């Protein structure tokens, strides 16, 4: 349901913006495409009815001077940013029937201070040069859920390349454990006589972190680990 909603919202926002500004193009007049990446429960095929959407917007336009081809042209960068803003507005506007979804965009490069819609070359450079280990963990459960197949293919190639990097196992273990302990300190609601099934020791998030560690540790040698974003099939593969 969520993926159908995302695709429809994207189509509506796209139609609205292209009617005003035209289509984003490069010097050859070609549209380089736009895609929505789903992270977390959405990317991992575990979305519940009460879940929010962890999203990242990427596009294929890398020329900062490229413009749309309509009567009121704007730069491609502005167009894609407005597209993302319009989509978030449509997801989160409250109506008498409620809202579609809460949206979390903090997993994009540089978090809340980063561009709302990121050129895919910038996304790739960030993942190679600046991303923290926890951001690579997040890639384990990331996949394109709507958008241009060309951008989807480029994203998947980047994802696989990052996850298949050979890493220092000792540093990886320290990084993963440090992040897990930070999360536990803030989120674990276990108490005497009560166990937090999600955040408690041995709970759901511990299992997720173990799976993510395993992918980052061994995907360099066992590429079949790159084929899934959900914990069930990753556990079966392991």
Model features per residue range: what roles?
Residues 1-238:
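A nucleotide- and high-energy phosphate-metabolite-utilizing enzyme signature
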